[in-house]
Structures are given as structure tokens and as C-alpha cells.
């Protein structure tokens, strides 16, 4: 008899951050310089104490030091750097300590508000600490009293960076070297949420008092046209409305405009802070209830509950003169108001699929 037990999906694979890759390659290059040992794999210790072995593509001497490279494996996370070659070039220096430099494909910070000063290579604090810890331990092991100049690069990083928020954050010339745990967790979205927080921080540090958080390109275009806001004021929040609102609780601005498609805004209005379809759905009966409170008759309510999409429910309400878009924005505003400090002026905008405003609340 045929076994009809459904096949269990394989668990999603974890991967390693660019910070882990930079640590492994810088350690391998430095070991070649101090011990004459060219490895094809190297063990590193992650910030939480796990030991992992990372395979190297090369480890070789150069005219002024040594270099090593590894292929970034992000596991099953849809990471823009997955499969990229990340490399470190290390040179010994008389002065003690570790100094970091941006190689090809790694960006440089040009705006205030990030975790690094303007002019520094975009190598975040945790990866810097990881590399420093490993290199200092290696130096102690070999009785080396000097320092290290470490240059980190990403092959093709200049082009890959265009797919990230780095250009808007003022990180020019390439990618950032990231990571807080050393591990990439599949679909954790932590990097995206971090970029939202960074976008807000950069705006604040550069004197932007009014930011617009947008779910996508159409809503961003609508906000740009409506307010003539600079790119620095436009925050690509995607589905992560909660990431914006909760960060503003800690780092407020004077004014927040949130703009999204009507369906996305209806999820926020219902109290959902993650607007992705995996985590929230559109509540048509709730939309019908709100329409009823604005005077919708029984027939319209029934039609809205039976609608196939939120857009269909919106059109039905509009045809009957019920301002459903404004109602949804008003409820979304209440949700945001409960999270964001009262000093922040908030307004909500909903757009249709053509990018036209179909609702507003202030």
C-alpha cells in the first residue's frame, strides 16, 4: 500500500554573517604571516561562544602581507551577499592594535547617525570586535607585539550594495560588514529591521524632523510627490510597521507620515504590526463593521464581507459613499498612537494600486 504520509520539509539551514566571514579570512591571513601556515579552513569563535569551522577559497602571501577569502554561505536565508566572495588582506604593523580599512566592495560611512563615525569603513562594531579578539589571541600565541592592518573586501560588492539600503543611509562604495551573533537565521529579517532603525537614526542625526515610512515603491513615490521629502526622510519599512513605531518610542522625530497600500494599512488598523501575509491577514468582516459604524447599510456590509479582496471591499464602499479609506487610516492612527510618544505628530495615508490616495487620517 502506498504511504500517503506527507513528506516533512527539511529544516532550514543557518548561515554565517559577513562579519563571521571577515573574521575567518582575517585570522587565516594573519596566521599565514605569523606562523607560515596556509589553511584551507579555519575555526572561529562566535560572540555567544559557539565554535565553527569555515572553509576558505584561498589563503596566500601577497607583496605586502597575506590574503584569504571565503564564499559567503547564508544558509537558506535570501541574503543579497549569499555566494559572494569575501576576503581579507592583512599586513603587519609596528604599532599595536588592529586598524580596519575598506577594500573593494566595502562601503564607507559618509553620514552621521550610524554606529560608526563618518569616514570609517562600514565594518560594524561586533565584526570589528570579533576580528580584534581573534587577532590579539593569535598575536599572544606567537609572542607578536605589533599590530595589524586589516582590509576587508567583497567581490562585486559595489553592485550588490545597490540592492540594499546602503546608498540611502550614506554608505557609499559598497556593502556593510554586519552581524551581531555571527549566524544568519533563515527569514529572521533582522538585517532589514536593522536597516529601518539605521534609516531613522541617520535622518535624526542629519536634522530631518519629518520622516515618511512607506510599505513599497508606490507609497514612497506618493509621499515624495506629496511632501517633496528628501530621500533621507523616506524610510522603506516594507511589512515592518512595528519596527518603525517601536524604534520611534526610543528615538522620536517631530513628525511621522505612514503610507501604504489599502490592504496593508487595514492590517495595521486591525492591530497587526507585521503586515506580511505569513503573519497577518485582511479582516473583511472587520472592514464591514467599520463601514457599518459610518452608516453602511446591511446589503453593503454583506457584500463587503463576501468580497474577494480588500480592494473590492474598498470599491464597494466608495460606490456607496462610505469613506472606508479614511476609516482604516483612523484606526491605524490609533494603533500607532498607542506605541509612539505623544510628542510625535502622526498621520496615515492609504493608496490604491495606482498610487492614488484613498484615505488619510491626522
Swiss-Prot record:
Protein EC: 2.1.1.195
Key words of the record: Cobalamin biosynthesis, Methyltransferase, S-adenosyl-L-methionine, Transferase
Annotated GO MF terms: cobalt-precorrin-5B C1-methyltransferase activity
A single BP term in Gene Ontology: anaerobic cobalamin biosynthetic process
Associated pathway: Cofactor biosynthesis; adenosylcobalamin biosynthesis; cob(II)yrinate a,c-diamide from sirohydrochlorin (anaerobic route): step 6/10
Known catalytic reactions: Co-precorrin-5B + S-adenosyl-L-methionine = Co-precorrin-6A + S-adenosyl-L-homocysteine
Pfam families linked to this entry: CbiD
EC class of the enzyme, as a word: transferase
Similarity-based family: Belongs to the CbiD family.
Classification via HAMAP family: CbiD (MF_00787)
Name recorded for this polypeptide: Cobalt-precorrin-5B C(1)-methyltransferase
Organism, as annotated: Burkholderia orbicola (strain MC0-3)
Encoding gene per record: cbiD
